Amino acid sequence: MKNIMKRYLNQLLLVALIASAFVVTMLNTKAQQSQTTPDAGYLSPTAPVATGKAPGMKVRLLSESGGVKNYVIVLGKRDEVMSGLTDFAKENKITSARFSAIGAFSRATVAWFDESRKEFKLIPIQEQVELVSMIGDIALSGSQPVVHTHVALASSDGTLRGGHLIEANVFPTLELFLTAYPASLHKQFDPATTLKLIDPTLK
C-alpha cells in the first residue's frame, strides 16, 4: 500500500513539474511576442493608408469658381473609404479640402487617441451600420495629401459609436460632397502627441 501511495505521489509531483514548466514557457513566449510585435488593439498615427481598394469609386466635378472646386464622390459596394479618398486626393492634386458624407458600411474600424500611449486605440465594428455623420479634411504632410475624418455610426438598435475613422467597407453606398480650395494647408509634427496637425500659418 505504501509503495502504491509513493508511486501516486511521485506521479502527481511529475505532473505538477510538467505543468509548471509549460506555464513558464507560455509566459516567456508571450513576453517575447509583446516585445517584438505591436499591440493588435492599437495603431500608430504614422501607419500608412492602403491604396487601390476602392475600384467602384465615381467622381464628378460639380462646379469651379475662383479656384474652388466642388466634387461629388460616390463609393460602391465593398469599396474601402480611406483608400478611395486618399487615391482621389492624390489623383486630383488636392492640397486643402473639407468634406461630409452619408451612407452605410458593412464593417468599419474607428479609433480613439490614447494620449498616454500616443497611439490610436482601435474599435472594430463587425456589423452593418448606418453612417449618421462623416466629416473631414484634407491637408498636406510634406508633399502628400492626408485624409482625416471622424464618423458617427448607428447599429440596428440605434446605438451610436464613433471616432477617428481608420477603415470602412461601403455597403451599399457612400455619397460624399467635397470642396477643394486653391490655397494649400500643411500639417506639422507635434512632439507632444506625435501627431501631424494642421498649422494654418504654414505656406
Model feature map: region roles:
Residues 2-16:
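Bacterial N-terminal signal peptides that target proteins for export
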Residues 33-79, 83-90, 96-97, 106-147, ...:
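N-terminal intrinsically disordered, cationic/polar leader segments
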Residues 1, 5, 22-27, 47, ...:
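A general, composition-driven signal for non-globular sequence regions
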